[in-house]
Amino acid sequence: MNKKTLKDIDVKGKRVFCRVDFNVPMKDGKVTDETRIRAAIPTIQYLVEQGAKVILASHLGRPKGEVVEELRLNAVAERLQALLGKDVAKADEAFGEEVKKTIDGMSEGDVLVLENVRFYPGEEKNDPELAKAFAELADVYVNDAFGAAHRAHASTEGIAQHIPAVAGFLMEKELDVLSKALSNPERPFTAIVGGAKVKDKIGVIDHLLDKVDNLIIGGGLSYTFIKALGHEVGKSLLEEDKIELAKSFMEKAKKNGVNFYMPVDVVVADDFSNDANIQVVSIEDIPSDWEGLDAGPKTREIYADVIKNSKLVIWNGPMGVFELDAFANGTKAVAEALAEATDTYSVIGGGDSAAAVEKFNLADKMSHISTGGGASLEFMEGKELPGVVALNDK
C-alpha cells in the first residue's frame, strides 16, 4: 500500500484522533452486533500499548446534523470498555473547550470516545471549520474507518488536511485484500453479484467484467437479466429501464471471454411471506402472477460447483430474500460452498452478504469479511475512496 500506516509513525505521548466505524446495530439502547467494534480493537490496543492518548471518533446512524439521544455513543463506549478490558471515558461533545480540557487531563494509554460526529451538520458537509476543530484536538490522525472511507466528511477527509494522517490496521488490511484481489487475482477468479437492484450494481458489474473469469448473477437483479433473455418474469422485481443494459453486460462478458452465470431455475411464490405457496420453475416458466424470490436447486448446484473450482471469490449481495427462511436456500448454498471450498480465498463484500454468513454461522469459515458495504462496493467499481486519498503518501 502506498499510504503511510500506523507503523510509519511514533505515537508515544501524542494525542491521536482515530476515526473508527462504530456504526453498529442498536436495540433498546443496547449494541446488538459488535463486529465493527471488535474490528477496530487491534488498532486501539496498539495505540494504547504505544502510549498514545487515544481519542476515538465515529458516527452512529443518521441523526442528520442534530442531537438524537438514542444515537449517543455511550452504549458503544461501554461495549468497547468490556472488550478492551480497560476504562474508556466518554465525552458529551465531539470538539470544543470542554473536550480539550478532558484530553489535557488524559494520561498515556487512556482512551476517550467522542460524541457522535454526525450530530454536527458540518460533518457530512465536510465543513473546513469543523475539520479544523477536530484537528485541534490532536497531533496525529489515524483513519481506521474503512466503512466510511467512501465519504468525504470532516472526520474522514477534512481533518487529514491539517495534521499528519495515516491508515489504521483495519483500513490497511481492507485495502490490501481488496486491491490484491482486483489487481493481481489468483485464478480462476469468480465474482458473485446479487442483491435487489441492477442500478446499485452497474459500476461493479461493469468493472468486474474486465477482471474476472466467472461472473455469477443472483438475487432480485437477476430477473432483469432473465427478461433480457426474452423470458417473462411474472411479478418478480424488474427494472424495465435496465433491460438493454443487462443485454450489453451479457455481450461484454462474451467479448471478454467471461463465463456469465445466471439462474436456470428459481423459487417462485404467490405472496411475499414465509407462509406463501411456493414452487420451483425453470426461468422460461415463471407464472404471470407469481414472483421469483430465490435461486432454484439446479442453479444452486451450478453456482456451488463454480465456487469450488475457483481460487478467489468476491461476493457482494444475496441470492434471494434470505431474511425469510423459505427463500434463504440460494444465499445459504453460496455461503456453504464458500465455507467448504478450503482452497478458495473468499472475500465477502460487507452489507447483506456479511449479514448472511453471520446468519448461517459460517463467518469464521470466510477468508475476509469486509466491514464496509458501500466502501467495498465503490472500491470494486474502481473508484478512489476520499478517506484513503486524503492520507499521507509513503
Curated annotation (Swiss-Prot):
Protein name: Phosphoglycerate kinase
Catalytic reaction(s) noted: (2R)-3-phosphoglycerate + ATP = (2R)-3-phospho-glyceroyl phosphate + ADP
Residues where substrate binds: D21, F22, N23, R36, H59, L60, G61, R62, R118, R151
GO cellular component assignments: cytosol
Superkingdom of origin: Bacteria
Catalytic EC class: transferase
Pathway membership, UniProt: Carbohydrate degradation; glycolysis; pyruvate from D-glyceraldehyde 3-phosphate: step 2/5
Any GO MF annotation of the entry: phosphoglycerate kinase activity
Modified residues (Phosphothreonine): T299
Primary location class: cytoplasm
UniProt KW keywords: ATP-binding, Cytoplasm, Glycolysis, Kinase, Nucleotide-binding, Phosphoprotein, Transferase
Organism listed in the record: Priestia megaterium (strain DSM 319 / IMG 1521) (Bacillus megaterium)
Family per record: Belongs to the phosphoglycerate kinase family.
Enzyme Commission number(s) of this protein: 2.7.2.3
Subcellular location: Cytoplasm
InterPro entries (alphabetical): Phosphoglycerate_kinase, Phosphoglycerate_kinase_CS, Phosphoglycerate_kinase_N, Phosphoglycerate_kinase_sf
Binding site for ATP: K201, G292, E323, G350, G351, D352, S353
Gene3D superfamilies recorded: Phosphoglycerate kinase, N-terminal domain
